[in-house]
């Protein structure tokens, strides 16, 4: 029975493990939303599923390209279409999971055209004041402290000369997914910190430093995926800028900061069917799939 749904959550929340369990039990396939797992050879730093796990369940969005190859959201849409076609032909569930909420939001809301960056001649307060005058729709959705959104709004305004909210409606492509059940795994901040610490230690034991050295020796250090959390700190360690203890601490700190940003993004961008810890989410998803199986 084909259906599609998403399991989201912060980094180290256990969403990939839950997706794997559900896929094994219901003969499903997985589409990864992880922006680092896309890359071949970045296995430990991306917390990619093991080779055994990848062999047990068909995955899309994992090991798609090499670190020195370009990637875009449009390319991700094509991977989604491949995954959906496969699941339709196999008549099985498609489980979408990972931490890159931007990919998921783009599939649900459509993809806006790229807008060139411009010099930000105004402060955030000045941009927000301008938006309040000409684009109250934007101000109703976003905080005056949201620097990223304010900069994007200003870029669109300078590029188009139009009201950004109106311009986006007129120029954004149609969503590739019209409706999607979304389940979010949520832990307390303390629980996530502890999970991050355990995962970071496991990454070192699995050979994170050796993987980082191989990647830097092969590709240099300037490629975007090689400046991700877990790798950028290794570069500082190799340069003797930080100690081994500081290396682990910084990776944990930066990962926890990422988790906080992901939680904020998920809360503001998606309507969920369920929010809770993995065991409760598992039961909700099983109920959802059983209901899907009953549909004519």
UniProtKB/Swiss-Prot annotation:
It catalyses: adenosine(37) in tRNA + dimethylallyl diphosphate = N(6)-dimethylallyladenosine(37) in tRNA + diphosphate. Its EC number is 2.5.1.75. It is an enzyme of class 2 (transferase). Gene3D superfamilies: 1.10.20.140, P-loop containing nucleotide triphosphate hydrolases. Keywords: ATP-binding, Magnesium, Nucleotide-binding, Transferase, tRNA processing. Residues 34-37 are annotated as: Interaction with substrate tRNA. The record marks 100 as: Interaction with substrate tRNA. ATP binds at residues 9-16. It comes from the Bacteria. Its cofactor is Mg(2+). Pfam families: IPPT. This is tRNA dimethylallyltransferase. The lineage of its organism: Bacteria, Pseudomonadati, Campylobacterota, Epsilonproteobacteria, Campylobacterales. The gene is miaA.
């Amino acid at each position: 029975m084909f259906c599609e749904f998403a399991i989201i959550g912060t980094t180290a929340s256990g969403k990939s493990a839950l997706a794997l369990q559900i896929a094994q039990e219901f003969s499903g396939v997985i589409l990864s939303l992880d922006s680092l797992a896309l890359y071949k050879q970045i296995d430990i730093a991306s917390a990619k599923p093991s080779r055994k796990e990848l062999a047990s369940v068909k995955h899309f969005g994992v090991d798609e390209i090499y670190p020195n190859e370009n990637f875009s959201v449009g390319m991700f849409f094509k991977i989604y279409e491949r995954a959906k076609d496969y699941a339709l032909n196999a008549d099985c569930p498609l489980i979408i999971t990972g931490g890159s909420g931007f990919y998921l939001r783009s599939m649900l809301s459509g993809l806006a055209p790229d807008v060139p960056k411009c010099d930000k001649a105004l402060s955030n307060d000045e941009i927000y004041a301008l938006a309040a005058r000409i684009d109250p729709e934007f101000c109703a959705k976003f905080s005056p402290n949201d620097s990223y959104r304010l900069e994007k709004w200003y870029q669109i305004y300078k590029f188009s000369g139009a009201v950004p909210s109106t311009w986006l409606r007129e120029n954004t492509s149609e969503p590739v997914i019209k409706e999607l059940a979304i389940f979010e795994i949520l832990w307390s901040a303390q629980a996530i910190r502890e999970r991050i610490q355990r995962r970071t230690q496991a990454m070192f034991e699995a050979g994170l430093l050796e993987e980082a050295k191989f990647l830097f020796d092969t590709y240099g250090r300037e490629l975007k995926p090689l400046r991700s959390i877990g790798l950028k700190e290794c570069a500082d360690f190799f340069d003797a800028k930080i100690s081994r203890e500081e290396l682990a601490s910084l990776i944990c700190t930066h990962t926890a900061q990422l988790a906080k940003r992901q939680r904020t993004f998920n809360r503001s961008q998606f309507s969920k069917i369920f929010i809770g810890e993995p065991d409760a989410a598992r039961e909700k998803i099983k109920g959802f799939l059983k209901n899907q199986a009953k549909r004519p």
